[in-house]
Design a protein with these regions (language model features):
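Short glycine-/acidic-enriched loop or helix-start segments at secondary-structure transitions
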Residues: 3-4, 26, 83-85, 123-124, ...
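Cofactor-binding loop segments of dinucleotide-utilizing enzymes, especially the Rossmann-like FAD-
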Residues: 19, 116, 165-167
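Conserved beta-strand scaffold positions in the cores of enzyme catalytic domains, especially
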Residues: 45, 111-113, 162
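A Rossmann-like FAD-binding core segment of flavoenzymes
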Residues: 11-101
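FAD-site-proximal beta/loop scaffold in flavoenzymes
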Residues: 67-135, 139, 143
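C-terminal, flexible cofactor-proximal segment of oxidoreductases
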Residues: 124, 133-193
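Rossmann-like NAD(P)H-binding beta-loop-alpha module
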Residues: 1-13
Length: 193
């Protein structure tokens, strides 16, 4: 959504394909605000349209061609790399490394995994959560090398989601609350730095 809104004024025809509902898992208010911004910026949105393959200059969903064009920017959600599952590390059903709160692999405690390659209950695959794991990862790598005690990464419940709206503002979603505007854009800019 952020990428589509950022590109909307620079790309004459822009389409966003979602395998599930737009911003699935987030509050209805945030989804409605995002839909409004996308419509206002003339971004075509296709929900429940997972892209199964790219054939030449066509996007295919199932067996149907759903888009044809010369320029494609593909942004998928987090996907486990095939080598991870083939490595012998314990993985979840999607191929992400099972990790303990110490960020160690359950099957190979000498291996640490964070971010989009790791599966830690209660932690979304998002840059925000990955960045919050870094201090614990750094401390634990140092402790492991010294033979010291490891710290647990603690999830802090649902954090607010800020999506850049492409106009200097941002959309906020938190639990069942949503808002939008320039103030939230300044907050997002501050947090991203």
């Amino acid at each position: 959504v952020e990428m589509a809104l950022a590109l909307a004024d620079q790309v004459p025809q822009l389409a966003l394909f979602c395998g599930e509902p737009l911003l699935a898992g987030h509050c209805a208010g945030l989804r409605m605000r995002a839909w409004g911004h996308l419509r206002m910026r003339r971004v075509q949105v296709r929900e429940h349209c997972p892209i199964s393959r790219i054939d030449g200059n066509c996007l295919i969903s199932g067996e149907a061609s759903v888009w044809r064009g010369n320029r494609l920017l593909l942004a998928s959600g987090a996907q486990a790399l095939p080598w991870i599952a083939a490595s012998g590390l314990s993985c979840d059903g999607d191929g992400f490394v099972h990790t303990a709160p110490t960020l160690q692999s359950h099957s190979h405690p000498q291996v640490f995994a964070v971010g989009d390659c790791a599966s830690l209950p209660g932690v979304r695959k998002s840059g925000l959560y990955s960045m919050r794991q870094v201090p614990v990862l750094a401390a634990n790598l140092s402790a492991a090398l010294r033979g010291g005690a490891l710290r647990d990464y603690k999830t802090h419940g649902q954090r607010p989601l800020l999506l850049a709206s492409g106009d200097g503002g941002a959309l906020l979603g938190w639990h069942q609350w949503s808002a939008g505007g320039q103030l939230y854009g300044r907050c997002k800019d501050y947090f991203d730095r």
